[in-house]
Curated annotation (Swiss-Prot):
UniProt entry tagged with the keyword Endoplasmic reticulum: no
Organism name: Corynebacterium nephridii
Biological classification of the source: Bacteria, Bacillati, Actinomycetota, Actinomycetes, Mycobacteriales
Record-stated family: Belongs to the thioredoxin family.
A GO molecular-function annotation: protein-disulfide reductase activity
Domain Thioredoxin residue range list: 2-108
Name listed for the protein in its UniProt record: Thioredoxin C-2
Length: 108
């Protein structure tokens, strides 16, 4: 996994996401989710490409149920973009690299 992608927990979500100084793309995922696994390498590439501009954080919905419930995550993968501790955009489902890059560009 890229050094710029952070795996967070319910306990660390505040510090890793809500208190972050840069925009944060949060990937809600699960190990059993094939589409989640499909976009993982793309997110790694994007984390390197957008280093310093966007922080990418992964939330495993099976171990971080409180956070998943708080943000009403019903389908995965779900990508939420946070700015200043608030959700500013959401992308649900797997998407090609070009669409994910455009999602980031439109929301940073």
């Amino acid at each position: 996994m890229s050094a710029t992608i952070v795996n967070t927990t319910d306990e660390n979500f505040q510090a890793d996401v809500l208190d972050a100084e840069t925009p944060v793309l949060v990937d809600f995922w699960a190990g059993w989710c094939a589409p989640c696994k499909a976009i993982a390498p793309v997110l790694e590439e994007l984390s390197n490409e957008y280093a310093g501009k966007v922080k990418i954080v992964k939330v495993d919905v099976t171990s971080c149920e409180d956070t998943a419930v708080k943000y009403n995550i019903r389908n995965i993968p779900a990508l939420l973009m946070f700015k200043d501790g608030e959700v500013v955009a959401q992308q649900v489902g797997a998407a090609p690299r070009s669409k994910l890059a455009a999602f980031i560009d439109q929301n940073i």
